[in-house]
């Protein structure tokens, strides 16, 4: 393991006219960009990744920390996407133990509410088939109430238990980047792409600037890949003004583990809009999430949770555990988006 790219040294060489020509330049230091860099190096390309903040600064460090096999895709009838997601989950479990680990999910049933036990059994059987292991099972009320103390027993009809995975998302990005760099790739953080270079109307490189606001450096590449996530339109609009990205925000709230200690994931449908809600353990805390709303604020500013989102998540939790002390703003350890 050689460590990460020496950015000061590489930038200095670029300013002196070295390392200006690349086969592939990847813009964006999240999991998508990191994965592309690794695959580019595996194919033998001279490849460089550029990130304007720190690696995994955006969505790739602010996820729900789950590697799911696309259960909701299956429920929506998208068999192909579900199969692909499940197989990728299994691959990550095999290749990144300690970063990606299996965890049990419990989807609760209530009388008269959809989906019921039979529907979920069918869905989960297909789900497990794609994974190559049948491990879903029915969990009765007794076991469920032992695992999730204070759960509302009104119309409760047990739960389906199935396996998905949790991930340390930011560390996974760093692992993939490290693999890429060990294989001869390069990655620069705190280096902003200020503009795209065009030759005969085609992108032929980028103009970059270090975080110290020094002079611009022009880099050439026949292939420039936009892996900037929510920022993709901003970069792409240099050559195409069409808007394709709809920024969304999913927020979580975090409470002390002592307030609600769990070791598995409980999932249920919100009483208001029937969206899926998860309660799960993470790094010695308990997390409740997530919301799903349009993010209309400046994406360069750190996103934050709104009071309405906090109320939504508090209502979700308290509706399931009415006999417990109601969780309120005073119990929150953090608000995450």
Where are these regions (language model features)?
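Extreme N-terminal leader/targeting segments of oxidoreductases
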Residues: 1-23, 39-42
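N-terminal Rossmann-like FAD-binding beta1-loop-alpha1 element of flavoenzymes
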Residues: 24-48
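Conserved small/polar residues in nucleotide/adenosyl-binding loops
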Residues: 330-337
